[in-house]
């Protein structure tokens, strides 16, 4: 039941924030700013320093308010570490069937990466709950629309190059949610500690989702 509730939360939010920072303190501040702006689904990538510790801290401090996941999960060892640290979903740039199986075993969401129609179908049939279309900026909204046409039953989450200028186009093209990184959590903004800016951007992305879904 929890897994389905978590999937519904991802789909309702429409935004999965990909968050990176140089310290766990910074990352917690980023997460708080995103939450204040209305984005409550967040992915901590395993490219950040001490990713497991960061996941544990964010889960401890904000786990009851956000849906926390781990990104750049390339193997089962990383997957297990992420799940034990509190991740409720795992995101990958590619498809590793064993990682998907681990998610299913523990009742967590699997969001593997794929790009071609064959890769997307393979990921979904392996048990993906959402397929991350990556790197989506290579083809843009037009490519996502072409994918979605024959595969309307597969939840697609474009990631890579999603910003405020094209977010609406991706949603209209069939995206169930958007994976948003640098255009939402800008590295320079984090370095300056301008978390108000991140809150503002989060609110703008959520406004785009609401507008597209109500028109």
Regions found by a protein language model. Give the residues of each.
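Short catalytic-loop micro-motif centered on adjacent basic/acidic residues
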Residues: 41-44, 90, 132-133, 157
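Histidine/lysine/aspartate-rich catalytic loop segments that bind and position anionic ligands
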Residues: 89, 93-138
């Amino acid at each position: 039941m929890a897994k389905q509730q978590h999937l519904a939360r991802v789909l309702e939010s429409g935004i999965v924030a990909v968050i990176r920072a140089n310290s766990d303190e910074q990352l917690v501040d980023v997460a708080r700013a995103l939450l204040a702006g209305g984005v409550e689904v967040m992915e901590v990538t395993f490219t950040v320093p001490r990713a497991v510790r960061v996941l544990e801290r964010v889960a401890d401090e904000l786990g009851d308010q956000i849906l926390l996941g781990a990104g750049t999960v390339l193997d089962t060892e990383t997957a297990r570490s992420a799940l034990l640290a509190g991740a409720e979903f795992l995101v990958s740039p590619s498809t590793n069937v064993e990682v998907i199986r681990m998610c299913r075993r523990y009742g967590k969401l699997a969001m593997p990466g794929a790009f071609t129609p064959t890769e997307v179908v393979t990921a979904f049939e392996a048990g993906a709950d959402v397929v991350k279309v990556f790197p989506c900026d290579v083809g843009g909204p037009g490519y996502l629309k072409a994918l979605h046409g024959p595969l309307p039953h597969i939840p697609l989450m474009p990631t890579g190059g999603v910003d405020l200028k094209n977010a609406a186009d991706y949603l209209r093209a069939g995206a169930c949610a958007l994976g948003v990184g640098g255009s939402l959590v800008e590295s320079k903004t984090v370095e300056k500690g301008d978390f108000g800016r991140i809150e503002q951007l989060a609110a703008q992305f959520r406004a785009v989702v609401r507008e597209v879904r109500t028109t």
